[in-house]
Amino acid sequence: MRLILSLPVLAVVLAMVLEGPAPAQAAPDVSSTLESISEKLTEFGRTVADKFRTAVDQIKKSDFPEKTRNWFSEMFNKLKEKF
C-alpha cells in the first residue's frame, strides 16, 4: 500500500524537477540585482539609524548618565582624599 501511494508522489516530484524554474523564478539580470542590493542597503541603513536614535533617546531619558557621573565623582574624591 505504501509503494502504491509513494509512486505517484515520486512521479509528481520528478515532473516538477524536470520542468525547471518558472519564469518568475528565473535568474534576475545584473542591473536589477544591483538595484535591489542598493535598496536593501538603504533600508538597512534607515533601520540601524532608527534603532540607534531610539537607544540614544532612552539613554538620555534614563538617570543612568547622572548616576554614573556621580559615582565617578565620588570615587575621584575618595582617591584625592587618600593621596
Swiss-Prot record:
> Which stretches are annotated as coiled coil?
none
* Listed GO biological process terms: lipid transport; lipoprotein metabolic process; negative regulation of cholesterol transport; negative regulation of lipid catabolic process; negative regulation of very-low-density lipoprotein particle clearance; triglyceride metabolic process; very-low-density lipoprotein particle clearance
The cellular component terms of Gene Ontology attached to this UniProt record, alphabetical and capped at eight, are:
high-density lipoprotein particle; very-low-density lipoprotein particle
N-terminal signal peptide? 1-26
Note the superkingdom of the native organism.
Eukaryota
Which keywords annotate this record? Lipid transport, Secreted, Signal, Transport, VLDL
Predominant location category: secreted
Q: Where in the cell is it found?
A: Secreted
Gene3D superfamilies associated with the record:
Apolipoprotein C-I
This molecule's function is given as: Inhibitor of lipoprotein binding to the low density lipoprotein (LDL) receptor, LDL receptor-related protein, and very low density lipoprotein (VLDL) receptor. Associates with high density lipoproteins (HDL) and the triacylglycerol-rich lipoproteins in the plasma and makes up about 10% of the protein of the VLDL and 2% of that of HDL. Appears to interfere directly with fatty acid uptake and is also the major plasma inhibitor of cholesteryl ester transfer protein (CETP). Binds free fatty acids and reduces their intracellular esterification.
Q: Which family does it belong to?
A: Belongs to the apolipoprotein C1 family.
Protein name (record): Apolipoprotein C-I
Protein's organism: Rousettus leschenaultii (Leschenault's rousette)
